[in-house]
A protein has these predicted regions:
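Signature of small four-pass
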Residues: 26-41, 92-140, 187-194
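Alpha-helical transmembrane segments and their immediate interhelical/interface regions
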Residues: 2-29, 79-112, 174
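Alpha-helical transmembrane segments of multi-pass integral membrane proteins
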Residues: 130-202
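Hydrophobic transmembrane signal anchors and adjacent membrane-proximal interface regions, especially
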Residues: 20, 50-52, 69, 97, ...
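Cytosolic juxtamembrane helix and N-cap/initiation of the first transmembrane helix
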Residues: 2-59, 187-202
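Long, glycine/tryptophan/cysteine-rich extracytoplasmic
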Residues: 40-91, 143-171
Length: 202
């Protein structure tokens, strides 16, 4: 008798509070955005971060520290300001990897639990992920300017040196901006596709 009464109460509850059906459009958009974020992180890890025509070298994440040591070991010019810029660059890249991990984790939680709050938080994080490679562009260009200033005493020997030939952003930064930009846009669009209510049933 109690089971029958409980069953009737449950039916009344579900009649008043109809279930919601998952938005598959939002699910697919979130999944694609998550993959793009992972691709951006992989590109920043594997592809060249910047190139130096003057040193005839392309530098990826693994070669970053060795590149800094090469410049620090030479005694011809003072590159302390340039090394500070590279340290700032490395810190931003590490933050980028952390935010990508947070973004991917939130995306997985969104795919599983499908909560609007998770979508909003993930969109905010995705904006931070997008902002970092854009900032890296300015850091790399500023570092190139610092290095060009340090090389001014040697211009009589090597001639005029353009900052872009000393240091220029490469594939990893460009790819990260493209991938994270598209991902942030997809996360934004997914916010407009909410769960739909299923017709009331007894």
């Amino acid at each position: 008798m109690n089971q029958s009464t409980l069953s009737d109460a449950q039916k009344i509850y579900y009649t008043r509070q109809p279930k919601k059906r998952r938005s598959w459009v939002s699910f697919i958009l979130t999944l694609i955005a998550m993959v793009l974020t992972a691709m951006a992180a992989y590109s920043m890890y594997r592809d060249p971060l910047f190139t130096s025509s003057f040193l005839n070298q392309a530098v990826n994440y693994h070669q970053f520290q060795h590149f800094t040591q090469q410049l620090g070991n030479q005694g011809l010019i003072d590159v302390s300001n340039f090394e500070e810029e590279l340290s700032r660059l490395l810190s931003m890249i590490n933050i980028f990897f952390v935010l990508c991990c947070v973004n991917i984790t939130l995306a997985i939680l969104t795919l599983v639990f499908n909560r609007t709050l998770l979508k909003i938080l993930n969109f905010i994080v995705s904006l931070g992920v997008l902002l970092i490679p854009v900032i890296l562009l300015f850091i790399i260009r500023d570092a190139a300017t610092q290095l060009a200033s340090a090389l001014e005493p040697l211009q009589a020997l090597v001639g005029n040196i353009e900052a872009t030939s000393l240091l220029a952003e490469s594939n990893a930064v460009h790819n990260a901006i493209i991938y994270t930009g598209i991902a942030a846009f997809l996360y934004l669009i997914s916010l407009f596709f909410r769960n739909r209510k299923i017709g009331t049933r007894l």
